[in-house]
């Protein structure tokens, strides 16, 4: 079990020169969802990440790992507007593994996704909203 602690994400953004520090906000004792967010004066404007791991159940035989990212964008009209969210960007990634999967198989899927997200196909699809042809 990993301890919930500060996570620093470097080399992010379109130019790869941004850093984001996510501070632990706690783990919901009811559903086990761990929350991290960027420290900010206005909670609604904080970038957030949640991570959860669901155990297999009687009806669902697989482990489910869910990672959600929420990045709000603040109003920037010459700095004259009240702090408010003008739009949101979301990402929701779900991994599903059988109880018999190995850590090697799970690591392969995780690193495969990281490499795929860095590929020109996904960069064009996500950044430019261009479909593949």
UniProtKB/Swiss-Prot annotation:
Annotated positions for site RNA-binding: 90
Compartment list: Virion
GO molecular function terms attached to this record: RNA binding; structural molecule activity; translation repressor activity
Main location: virion
One cellular component term from this protein's GO annotations in UniProt: T=3 icosahedral viral capsid
Effect of residue 50 to A: Decreased RNA-binding to the viral operator and loss of repressor activity
Keyword Nuclease: no
Family matches, as Pfam families: Levi_coat
InterPro entries named among the record's database cross-references: Levivir_coat, Phage_RNA-type_capsid
Effect of substituting residue 76 to A: In strain: QB_1 and Qbeta_1_FR
Outcome (variant: residue 60 to C): Decreased RNA-binding to the viral operator and loss of repressor activity
Keywords per UniProt: Capsid protein, RNA-binding, T=3 icosahedral capsid protein, Translation regulation, Virion
Described purpose of this protein according to its UniProt entry: Capsid protein self-assembles to form an icosahedral capsid with a T=3 symmetry, about 26 nm in diameter, and consisting of 89 capsid proteins dimers (178 capsid proteins). Involved in viral genome encapsidation through the interaction between a capsid protein dimer and the multiple packaging signals present in the RNA genome. Binding of the capsid proteins to the viral RNA induces a conformational change required for efficient T=3 shell formation. The capsid also contains 1 copy of the A2 maturation protein. Acts as a translational repressor of viral replicase synthesis late in infection. This latter function is the result of capsid protein interaction with an RNA hairpin which contains the replicase ribosome-binding site.
Subunit structure: Homodimer. The homodimers binds to the viral RNA via an operator hairpin, but also to many other RNA sequences in the viral genome; this interaction probably shifts the virus from the replicative to the assembly phase and ensures specific encapsidation of the viral genome. Interacts with the maturation protein A2.
Family according to the record: Belongs to the Leviviricetes capsid protein family.
Protein name: Capsid protein
UniProt source species: Escherichia virus Qbeta (Bacteriophage Q-beta)
């Amino acid at each position: 079990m990993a301890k919930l602690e500060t996570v620093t994400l470097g080399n992010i953004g379109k130019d790869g020169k941004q850093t984001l520090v996510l501070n632990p906000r706690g783990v919901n004792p009811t559903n086990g969802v761990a929350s991290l967010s960027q420290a900010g004066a206005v909670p609604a404007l904080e970038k957030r990440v949640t991570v959860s791991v669901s155990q297999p159940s009687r009806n669902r035989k697989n482990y489910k790992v869910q990672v959600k990212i929420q990045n709000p964008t603040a109003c920037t009209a010459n700095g004259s507007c009240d702090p408010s969210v003008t739009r949101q960007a979301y990402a929701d990634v779900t991994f599903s593994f059988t109880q018999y999967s190995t850590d090697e198989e799970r690591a392969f899927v995780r690193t495969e996704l990281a490499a795929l997200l860095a590929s020109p196909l996904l960069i064009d699809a996500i950044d430019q909203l261009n479909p593949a042809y």
